[in-house]
Amino acid sequence: MSFDIAKYPTLALVDSTQELRLLPNESLPKLCDELRRYLLDSVSRSSGHFASGLGTVELTVALHYVYNTPFDQLIWDVGHQAYPHKILTGRRDKIGTIRQKGGLHPFPWRGESEYDVLSVGHSSTSISAGIGIAVAAEKEGKNRRTVCVIGDGAITAGMAFEAMNHAGDIRPDMLVVLNDNEMSISENVGALNNHLAQLLSGKLYSSLREGGKKVFSGVPPIKELLKRTEEHIKGMVVPGTLFEELGFNYIGPVDGHDVLGLITTLKNMRDLKGPQFLHIMTKKGRGYEPAEKDPITFHAVPKFDPSSGCLPKSSGGLPSYSKIFGDWLCETAAKDNKLMAITPAMREGSGMVEFSRKFPDRYFDVAIAEQHAVTFAAGLAIGGYKPIVAIYSTFLQRAYDQVLHDVAIQKLPVLFAIDRAGIVGADGQTHQGAFDLSYLRCIPEMVIMTPSDENECRQMLYTGYHYNDGPSAVRYPRGNAVGVELTPLEKLPIGKGIVKRRGEKLVILNFGTLMPETAKVAESLNATLVDMRFVKPLDEALILEMAASHEALVTVEENAIMGGAGSGVNEVLMAHRKPVPVLNIGLPDFFIPQGTQEEMRAELGLDAAGMEAKIKAWLA
């Protein structure tokens, strides 16, 4: 969309942070208003992450106004909230392309802009990276400042606390800004906090604080009295004791929507030495009433009409695989009170809303804590319960040692319901579910299942739930099911595939939900088609039978070729000295960028036309 200068006259003056810093203070509230309206106008036309960015408009303006970015280094955690940052750093006219194929990256991305210091997408990484960047800046000796912005959800993760503990030990010069959009601030308390925060962050207070420490360091009673007095003053504002104990100078909470107040506080804190912590209060969805009332629904949005405030409703077509999982979960829980379901802050995305309402005492949202989620499940299994960990493929990576050490080694019956497996689309490199088959397949005692449709998905969930000899995993994609009939639940024979079509010369071994496209290829080439179902254990007898009766084999999966299901087939053939040509079709050896699932599958040759072309070229 073209930029309307008349509609956004102040924002039109800002196409870089250098231009932003030329604006007088009194024009900044108007800039924030225009930036918020432009964000609404852009995202409603193009889709994208929405509510988080509305809540960080004033913070973004204040940070770029006070700090000399990009020389000073600003790090955003996760990046959902960074759309205003992109708009102010030379990408205003491209914001309508965000999350689209060939467009702006959905998160801060180092290859896109010098303002994007850290490529992000997963949570809770900013402080760790920020410490490293701050240490490097100190050694560089150019007085380069480091700022990390982290949300109240991301800061609950263990990695964030590990980083803060380290920062308190080595004491780098850096600022951590906690963007807290969970609490509401009353006008009076907010005003008091803002005033005290400015006092506590000011140079006079800082000088008195450090000078007093030096003067009275040899007089323990007075030193202790001063420390307690300072704690009491800060206690009038908020209980920031935890961050103080970790070694940070804590300031806040302050109103995150008062841009001029933020600028004053940030200027005061900019030159303070050691690790600093600024706690700001914001409202997710700020300035757009529907998003303020329902920030979860408006977290990421499709195209919508901002005047109505209504998001387009589902067409009522086929259910998503997440819905299939959620329905199975409720159905099974109603029959078995030993079922326990765990999610690391992905209730809506994993299809668990209904379960959380029907079975609240058996539903555990552990927040952004994937490592804890898996070991918590291990403990439930030891206690005689039947835990199910519902988790995205890309986030299970964060708990790999826990899967190995706490679940698999002990042969605990934990079921992993792995959503968003394969290509996920608009969130790009950081969110593709490209690696789960590779990183799980090498774990002893693990059963791995790849359904080809929603009925198989249900049967495999049922099979994994009743498998008591160790952990099991069922992986399924983002998107809708294919519309097959749902049959009564029954346990599948472990490690057994089925032949779907008999052909000649060529056999295609399919793993997972690319089956509809693979079936078209098999029909076109008159190839035998096998639904392998299990990646581990593989149906070795069936593989050897197919190798003996066909001239060539093709494996198909929506996972990295390296170490994936096809690699497992290769290993079986080599172990049995079967010199049969094999073509492995799957995800290539690079990080898959954003685009719709259909666009990326076509580009990577994972639609029917692409697979057929690959096979014909290989056979030629």
Curated annotation (Swiss-Prot):
Assembly mode: Homodimer.
Reaction(s) the record says it catalyses: D-glyceraldehyde 3-phosphate + pyruvate + H(+) = 1-deoxy-D-xylulose 5-phosphate + CO2
Residue numbers binding Mg(2+): 152, 181
Biological-process GO terms, alphabetical: 1-deoxy-D-xylulose 5-phosphate biosynthetic process; isopentenyl diphosphate biosynthetic process, methylerythritol 4-phosphate pathway; terpenoid biosynthetic process; thiamine biosynthetic process
InterPro entries from the UniProt entry: Dxylulose-5-P_synthase, THDP-binding, Transketo_C/PFOR_II, Transketolase-like_Pyr-bd, Transketolase_BS, Transketolase_C, Transketolase_CS
Residues reported to bind thiamine diphosphate: 80, 121-123, 153-154, 181, 288, 370
HAMAP family cross-referenced by the UniProt entry: DXP_synth
General function of this protein: Catalyzes the acyloin condensation reaction between C atoms 2 and 3 of pyruvate and glyceraldehyde 3-phosphate to yield 1-deoxy-D-xylulose-5-phosphate (DXP).
MF GO annotations: 1-deoxy-D-xylulose-5-phosphate synthase activity; magnesium ion binding; thiamine pyrophosphate binding
Keyword Magnesium: yes
Keywords from the UniProt entry: Isoprene biosynthesis, Magnesium, Metal-binding, Thiamine biosynthesis, Thiamine pyrophosphate, Transferase
Protein's name in the database: 1-deoxy-D-xylulose-5-phosphate synthase
PROSITE patterns: TRANSKETOLASE_1, TRANSKETOLASE_2
Family: Belongs to the transketolase family. DXPS subfamily.
The protein's annotated pathway: Metabolic intermediate biosynthesis; 1-deoxy-D-xylulose 5-phosphate biosynthesis; 1-deoxy-D-xylulose 5-phosphate from D-glyceraldehyde 3-phosphate and pyruvate: step 1/1
Pfam families reported in the protein's UniProt record: DXP_synthase_N, Transket_pyr, Transketolase_C
EC supergroup of this enzyme: transferase
Enzyme nomenclature, EC number: 2.2.1.7
Free-text remark on how the cofactor is bound: Binds 1 Mg(2+) ion per subunit. Binds 1 thiamine pyrophosphate per subunit.
Any single GO CC term annotated in Swiss-Prot or TrEMBL for this entry: cytosol
Cofactor: Mg(2+); thiamine diphosphate
